[in-house]
């Protein structure tokens, strides 16, 4: 395991903690896409089905459990504890537009036609587009709270660090995972416009608006 993988995991964890902290402190989930959070929970669920059958390391197991817990606690806060503050009128992205093609692609492009492998592949493809409902929500409302933009920044940073991790693994181990790399590149592309706005606006104390034609 190299430093890029560890930093990527920490960035991902920080993003989730920031989001949970924001919801808990404000007792409000306005501006947060519940649909994106459902997709992320689905990503972790289908990816970590091997949690009790395939032990790699304590670090790996702990991170899987933490990500699953954070994902489902976030969904619970949005649709349960603080559901009265949920902005359902603006969280209108049609999930079937993502789920149907991702399911189809998972059956067509995978490494092995087994249940666990197809579900793992599904999780990789789905993660690459799971943020779209959140970006769509921002483009629809015209702006995002600062803490939400920090959450998105660290999610994007996690993806960028994982790309560096794959490059490093290819150099040192001659390891190349085409499905993960291509999906990671696609996901990073979705964040590129956001990164520019984050640096030019948010870091200068301005509110972020994200025009995004869908």
UniProtKB/Swiss-Prot annotation:
> Positions of the site: Important for recycling of cargo proteins with the sequence motif K-D-E-L from the Golgi to the endoplasmic reticulum?
193
List GO BP terms, alphabetically.
protein retention in ER lumen; protein transport; retrograde vesicle-mediated transport, Golgi to endoplasmic reticulum
- Function of this protein? Receptor for the C-terminal sequence motif K-D-E-L that is present on endoplasmic reticulum resident proteins and that mediates their recycling from the Golgi back to the endoplasmic reticulum.
Localization annotation:
Endoplasmic reticulum membrane; Golgi apparatus membrane; Cytoplasmic vesicle, COPI-coated vesicle membrane
Q: Which family does it belong to?
A: Belongs to the ERD2 family.
Q: Where is this site: Interaction with the K-D-E-L motif on target proteins?
A: 5, 117
Q: InterPro entries, from UniProt?
A: ER_ret_rcpt
Q: Which UniProt keywords apply?
A: Cytoplasmic vesicle, Endoplasmic reticulum, ER-Golgi transport, Golgi apparatus, Membrane, Protein transport, Receptor, Transmembrane, Transmembrane helix, Transport
Q: How does it sit in the membrane?
A: Multi-pass membrane protein
Region (Interaction with the K-D-E-L motif on target proteins) location:
47-48, 159-169
Positions of region (Important for recycling of cargo proteins with the sequence motif K-D-E-L from the Golgi to the endoplasmic reticulum): 204-207
Q: Which regions form coiled coils?
A: none
Instruction: Give one Pfam hit by family name.
Output: ER_lumen_recept
Q: Which residues cross the membrane?
A: 5-24, 33-52, 59-79, 93-110, 117-135, 150-168, 179-199
Mapped to this chain, the residue ranges on the Cytoplasmic side of the membrane are 25-32, 80-92, 136-149, 200-214
The identity of this protein, by name, is: ER lumen protein-retaining receptor 3
Provide the domain comment: Binds the C-terminal sequence motif K-D-E-L in a hydrophilic cavity between the transmembrane domains. This triggers a conformation change that exposes a Lys-rich patch on the cytosolic surface of the protein. This patch mediates recycling from the Golgi to the endoplasmic reticulum, probably via COPI vesicles.
Molecular function GO terms recorded: ER retention sequence binding; KDEL sequence binding
So which stretches are on the Lumenal side? 1-4, 53-58, 111-116, 169-178
Q: What GO cellular component entries does it have? A: cis-Golgi network; COPI-coated vesicle membrane; endoplasmic reticulum; endoplasmic reticulum membrane; Golgi membrane; transport vesicle
